[in-house]
């Protein structure tokens, strides 16, 4: 089997896996009670095929999008419209213009979000009380409350929040800076994957319109430190590969939820245009890092081994929770299925389209897997910030066509 054929098989395998979890998520938008009826504890008064309030809108918009997409792919649209689309997809910004545009976008974002730093977080989120008690005990105190102790087991996060609280006198400062950097690295990763600055700008705009991202961008109790560290671990694969596992372990000790994400990092490295020797080095470094982290968790004094409890029915119900948590991100809900299908077509010319599919797959399936294997956690909206980032990068990839293609 040739290398090209093998590459296409990988692309199709990745696409099928991602399509499966996306369809499970979309199904719960159309039929919100379907999974609860068959897998939930209280199904007596449920109508499994009752349409959700977004169902008709979702189906109609997807029919329109797919119809237009097929017509464009088959060259069946009017020539003037095809010409406009091609000009947009091949358009590029100069480096200086990109810096100005990005500065304006970030300036508007920071300006509109800064007033949120003055809001008392204890009046916003009930979970802040747990964080407040954990900070009082940090770094040497212990608690019988599993929720408080879990906070203090996230060492990197607590150090950063402690610095923000005690040095900057505002616990929201560093979480907000982290969110700004998440936007910046969304641009950098898109530009790296697509080799187009315009694609990076598109991704930034898509991320900044996401309700879930804007809802949690200044929140300390649901900070984005872990998202930032994971994005840096992806970005450094092609820049300074030896830093990738370092930032991954920082992400892990910021939020253990990121633990399985290393598989996505390794796949991204596999699809990257780097030498085989470097790929082996990255794999080896991650094996060492993961082994050390597992040893610390199971042989150290952390709560994580004590919260494991397997309940397979919660896995399917997890997809229902995803659609519920992201119901206000209308653009994501409408576009996630078309983007998934479109990325497999883009993967013919850009292997990083496969990487984005894997990142979307992992970001979706991580939450159902988490609730299936533990009793301590439930599915929260802030955990989907990485999904929105990778979705935004996926959108950007449609604007990465080179003139020669």
Regions found by a protein language model. Name each.
Residues 214-223:
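Short acidic/glycine- and proline-prone juxtamembrane loop motifs at membrane-interface regions
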Residues 151, 155-184, 216:
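Loop-to-helix entry region of an early transmembrane alpha helix in multi-pass inner-membrane enzymes
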Residues 260-289:
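Perimembrane helix-loop-helix junctions
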Residues 242-267:
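Membrane-interface alpha helices of multi-pass inner-membrane proteins
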């Amino acid at each position: 089997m040739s290398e090209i054929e093998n590459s296409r098989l990988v692309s199709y395998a990745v696409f099928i896996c991602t399509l499966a979890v996306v369809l499970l998520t979309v199904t719960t938008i159309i039929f919100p009670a379907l999974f609860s009826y068959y897998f939930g504890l209280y199904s007596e008064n449920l109508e499994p095929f009752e349409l959700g309030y977004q169902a008709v809108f979702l189906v109609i918009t997807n029919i329109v999008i797919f119809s237009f997409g097929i017509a464009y792919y088959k060259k069946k649209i009017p020539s003037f419209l095809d010409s406009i689309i091609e000009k947009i997809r091949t358009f590029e910004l100069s480096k200086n213009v990109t810096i100005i545009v990005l500065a304006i976008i970030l300036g508007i974002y920071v300006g509109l979000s800064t007033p949120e730093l003055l809001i008392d977080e204890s009046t916003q989120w009930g979970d802040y009380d747990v964080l407040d008690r954990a900070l009082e005990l940090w770094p040497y105190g212990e608690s019988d409350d599993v929720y408080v102790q879990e906070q203090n087991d996230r060492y990197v996060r607590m150090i950063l929040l402690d610095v923000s609280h005690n040095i900057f006198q505002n616990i929201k400062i560093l979480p907000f800076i982290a969110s700004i950097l998440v936007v910046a690295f969304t641009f950098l990763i898109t530009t790296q994957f697509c080799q187009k600055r315009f694609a990076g700008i598109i991704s930034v705009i898509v991320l900044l319109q996401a309700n879930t991202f804007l809802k949690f961008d200044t929140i300390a109790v649901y900070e984005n430190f872990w998202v930032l560290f994971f994005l840096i671990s992806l970005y450094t694969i092609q820049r300074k590969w030896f830093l990738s596992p370092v930032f991954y372990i920082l992400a892990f000790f910021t939020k253990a939820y990121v633990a399985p994400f290393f598989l996505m990092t390794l796949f991204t490295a596999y699809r990257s245009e780097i030498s085989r020797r470097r790929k082996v080095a990255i794999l080896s470094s991650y094996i060492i890092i993961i082994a050390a982290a597992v040893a610390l968790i199971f042989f150290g004094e952390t709560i994580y081994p004590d919260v494991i409890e397997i309940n397979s029915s919660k896995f399917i119900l997890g997809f229902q929770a995803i659609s519920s948590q992201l119901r206000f991100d209308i653009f994501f809900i409408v576009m996630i299925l078309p983007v998934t299908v479109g990325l497999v077509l883009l993967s013919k010319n850009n292997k990083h389209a496969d990487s984005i599919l894997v990142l979307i797959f992992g970001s979706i399936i991580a939450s159902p897997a988490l609730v299936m294997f533990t009793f301590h956690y439930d599915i929260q909206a802030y955990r989907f910030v990485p999904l929105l980032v990778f979705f935004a990068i996926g959108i950007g990839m449609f604007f990465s066509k080179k003139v020669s293609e």
